[in-house]
Amino acid sequence: ARHTLNTAGQNTTSLRQRIPAGPNRILPPDGVAVGVLAARASLRGAWIAAANEPMKDVVALTPPIPASDWQALQDAQINLLRNDPRGFFALSADTLALDPELRLINVRRLLILLRRLALRRGTTYVFEPNGPVLRRSIQRGFDLLLTELFHRGAFAGATPAQAFRVVTDEGVNPRGSVDAGRLFVELRVAPSLPMRFIAVRLAQSGERLSVVEEL
């Protein structure tokens, strides 16, 4: 049978979990699912989904959900749990995002990672003179960072050139913007599944930093 974990946090089923040297407990599935997600992120990266990963110490799911409800639950972006001979698994890894390009949780987590990295690196550029030398330095730094993520499997593409681009040229930094003290860095990445590029733009204006995602 399949059961569900609502990605909005409203559980429609519970897990019965084995506790060493004690009685089994009935728990909502959220904690176990998040634990699987965290373990995969620690071992392989934030861009790895938790679907099809066995849940430890789970012995049952309750209550049963009729098979006739499965499709409606999937259409509502509710993640299904399944019991098979190998154990208990999450069959999907959806968020409640309305845009299908951002629906998968591993894509969302990859973009969160890139936002954090962009903001962290961006603080080192705040007091640098805004000119070609700075922009070349920024491009080299992000190229190295994204190349490392590419080799770890974060992006699609056979080569780094197919997987991402770091843009700091006049296309995103026109003269008027530079004269106004603004600096833009655009990271265009292809997450490691069939989908189009997503742009993460780091914007600096004076001492203020912001990050915007664009499809």
Please state what every model-predicted region is.
Residues 1-215:
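Structured, hydrophobic secondary-structure cores that serve as assembly/anchoring elements
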